[in-house]
A protein has these predicted regions:
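Ligand-binding clefts of soluble mixed alpha/beta catalytic domains
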Residues: 1-521
Length: 521
């Protein structure tokens, strides 16, 4: 065999060695946990044959605690580029079979390389996390490695989409990188995220809690809002990541892919003419409205299990990807609170950063009252949603279905926040407050006098409520002053949104020159 062929054989052997990660036994352990390896995940996510791997032969440089004898090619992370549905993406996947996926200086360098390239190429970045944390043997170098990654997360924010998949443990400082990305997906039962683990919590606070209840997927999907999606299986999780990518652009200079539309834009949905209940305090399901107006009724929801009183997610109108923000009357009457405001604000800001038009479906009676809300800074969080809508320069269309009261009316894409098109259904009630509250305030003195005179106060207040409703509980007062562009028939909503988006396709808007705003935090 010639020297050249011998070298090629050596290359092939090294590649095979690198592909084994921590070895066959470690791979089997990973499979026994019900988890795929880093390479298997990358192969599932990317188009077949498209993966271009970087730094396959890179090794760590640590000589402490006998680490020089524990070398594995690639050092615990698979990194490179590939395509998903033909679109370029950059990806890294931590390999739990190598030193439990712990982050070393070398791993950080590999991750930072694909992050830098993603920025240069204007392509989405996907990180699959499955790591025991920092590699303790490397000391401060491991911490510096995390910091290098975080800095790039920050610089890439608003420039390229960043998506994190939590497919195993993610603890300590490692949690900050997913927190800095745009979307996070967690695997149910096999992944968790927390700053301090159960043992530390027990030692410091005396609280006895397991990993799942401290930082499992269910906790972060329903209570903290840290994760945007959860999946029961890794196959399902991979498919969700692919679906998400189909709705968003590759970078902040582009728009999302337009899909062929087979659903007529002028399709009338007669059911919408009767979806609003006669009783103004009766709930209805906003999901039915969304399904009735979007292309083929499809909707990809973001954070479906968190703050259910507001709905956010992606849909298409005439093939164009759009962000939807909608109050949900079937949950807490659709009121805004701390979590709903936070959820809505983050989504609106993502849409604005990546050129996704925003369609708002409004039925909101106000902000949730109470000390629990005030003590948890509902003022600041409500201001975040207000700020997000106000700074957004993408096309914005608001449709008011029923209630739109007080400060919540302003916050939910009002005309004064430079919303381009504001429509209202005939059932819309745009006012400072509802009739019962308004009558109680406006006629307090008269009601008191009638009570002292022994007259029927309830009948008096009911009469005044009817008068208030006649005057304000309709869209025409707002339309009279130009705060509503048109009152539309509910069944015609899809067509009006599609036509409005086409009209706004060439919109150009700008903000005053500044380094950056100071959003209420």
């Amino acid at each position: 065999m010639s020297k050249q062929l011998e070298k090629i054989k050596q290359l092939i052997e090294k590649r095979e060695q690198a592909r084994l990660g921590g070895g066959e036994k470690a791979i089997q352990k990973q499979h026994d946990r019900g988890k795929y390896t880093a390479r298997e995940r990358v192969e599932m996510l990317l188009d077949e044959g498209s993966f271009e791997e970087y730094d396959m032969f890179k090794e760590h440089r640590c000589h402490n605690f006998g680490m020089e004898k524990k070398q594995f090619l690639g050092d615990g992370v698979v990194a490179g580029s590939g395509t998903i549905d033909g679109r370029l993406v950059f990806i890294f996947a931590q390999d739990f079979t190598v030193h439990a996926g712990s982050l070393s200086e070398t791993m950080s360098q590999k991750i930072c390389k694909v992050m830098d390239m993603a920025m240069k190429m204007g392509a989405p970045l996907i990180g699959i996390n499955d790591s025991g944390g920092a590699r303790i043997q490397e000391g401060i170098n491991a911490l510096a490695g995390y910091a290098e990654i975080f800095e790039r997360n920050i610089l890439a924010s608003g420039v390229i989409p960043q998506i994190s998949g939590i497919f195993g443990p993610c603890a300590g400082g490692a949690v900050y990188s997913p927190a800095l990305t745009d979307f996070t997906l967690m695997m149910e039962n096999t992944s968790y995220m927390f700053l301090t683990g159960p043992k530390v919590v027990k030692t410091v606070t005396g609280e006895d809690i397991d990993q799942e209840h401290l930082g499992g997927a269910s906790v972060h999907a329903t209570k903290s809002g840290v994760t945007h999606f959860t999946a029961a299986t890794e196959e399902e999780g991979i498919q969700m990541l692919k679906t998400l990518l189909s709705y968003i652009p590759s970078n902040n200079m582009e728009t999302a892919p337009v899909k062929p539309c087979t659903d007529p834009i002028n399709r009338m949905e007669d059911s919408l003419n009767e979806i609003i209940p006669e009783n103004p305090n009766e709930a209805y399901d906003m999901y039915k409205v969304i399904a009735a107006i979007t292309d083929n009724g499809e909707f990809f929801e973001v954070q479906p299990k968190f703050a259910k009183n507001i709905i956010v997610g992606f849909a298409r109108f005439n093939g164009q990807s759009v962000g939807i923000v909608a109050n949900q009357p079937a949950c807490y009457a659709g009121v805004l609170d701390v979590n709903a405001s936070r959820k809505g604000a983050r989504f609106v800001r993502f849409c604005d950063a990546f050129n996704s038009p925003i369609v708002s479906l409004v039925d909101v009676p106000g902000f949730l009252p109470g000390t629990g809300q005030e003590y948890n800074a509902v003022i600041l969080h409500g201001a975040q949603l207000l700020y997000a809508y106000g700074e957004a320069t993408v096309p914005k269309i608001t449709v008011t279905l029923r209630k739109s009261y007080g400060g919540s009316h302003i916050v939910m894409g009002s005309k004064q926040l430079h919303t381009d098109l504001n429509y209202a259904w005939p059932s819309a009630e745009i006012a400072v407050m509802g009739a019962s509250g308004a009558a109680a305030v406006l006629y307090a003195k008269e009601a008191k006098a009638k009570k002292e005179a022994g007259e029927d106060v309830k009948a008096f207040i009911a009469e005044k409520e009817d008068e208030y409703n006649e005057l304000f509980a309709n869209p025409y007062q707002a339309a009279k002053y130009g705060y509503i562009d048109d009152v539309i028939e509910p069944r015609n909503t899809r067509f009006r949104i599609c036509r409005g988006l086409a009209q706004l396709a060439t919109k150009r808007d700008s903000l005053p020159a500044k380094k950056h705003g100071n959003i209420p935090m």
